[in-house]
């Protein structure tokens, strides 16, 4: 006897007017995630996922392309304004914020949430080239 076909629920697109853009800019890559106020992810993109490999991933242009990609995907949810939270010392910090502004979002505020140790772990030794 054949099993009946499983019914799939239609995914409901929720409407979110204001969101939060989390920009994680490391030295090697840039990750841009756009969430709602509760932290549920709406869209995300990375420099590596945007087609950049190797040392080109860590450029400001790669961060710009990744932020545009994540921003355009979040437009489907009706996001109009963004609060930007930047974490990390990477080269794509400013360019990601600029490109989110160019996509058409109203940037309400920009917060730097880079974790700063109170003299925690010992840093890695210096490179000798």
UniProtKB/Swiss-Prot annotation:
GO terms for biological process: translation. Keywords: Ribonucleoprotein, Ribosomal protein, RNA-binding, rRNA-binding. Pfam families: Ribosomal_S11. One of its GO terms (cellular component) is ribosome. GO terms for molecular function: rRNA binding; structural constituent of ribosome. Gene3D superfamilies: Ribosomal protein S11 (3.30.420.80). It comes from the Bacteria. Belongs to the universal ribosomal protein uS11 family. Located on the platform of the 30S subunit, it bridges several disparate RNA helices of the 16S rRNA. Forms part of the Shine-Dalgarno cleft in the 70S ribosome. Part of the 30S ribosomal subunit. Interacts with proteins S7 and S18. Binds to IF-3. PANTHER family: 40S RIBOSOMAL PROTEIN S14/30S RIBOSOMAL PROTEIN S11. This is Small ribosomal subunit protein uS11. The gene is rpsK.
């Amino acid at each position: 006897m054949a099993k009946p076909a499983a019914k799939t629920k239609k995914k409901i697109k929720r409407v979110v007017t204001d969101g939060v853009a989390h920009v994680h800019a490391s030295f090697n890559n840039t990750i841009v995630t756009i969430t709602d106020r509760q932290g549920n992810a709406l869209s995300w993109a990375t420099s590596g996922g945007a087609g950049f490999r190797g040392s080109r991933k860590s450029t400001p242009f790669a961060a710009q392309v990744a932020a545009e990609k994540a921003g355009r995907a979040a437009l489907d949810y009706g996001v109009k304004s963004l609060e930007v939270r930047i974490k990390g010392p990477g080269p794509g910090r400013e360019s990601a914020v600029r490109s989110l502004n160019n996509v058409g979002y109203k940037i309400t505020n920009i917060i730097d949430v880079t974790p700063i140790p109170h003299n925690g772990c010992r840093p890695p030794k210096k490179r000798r080239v």
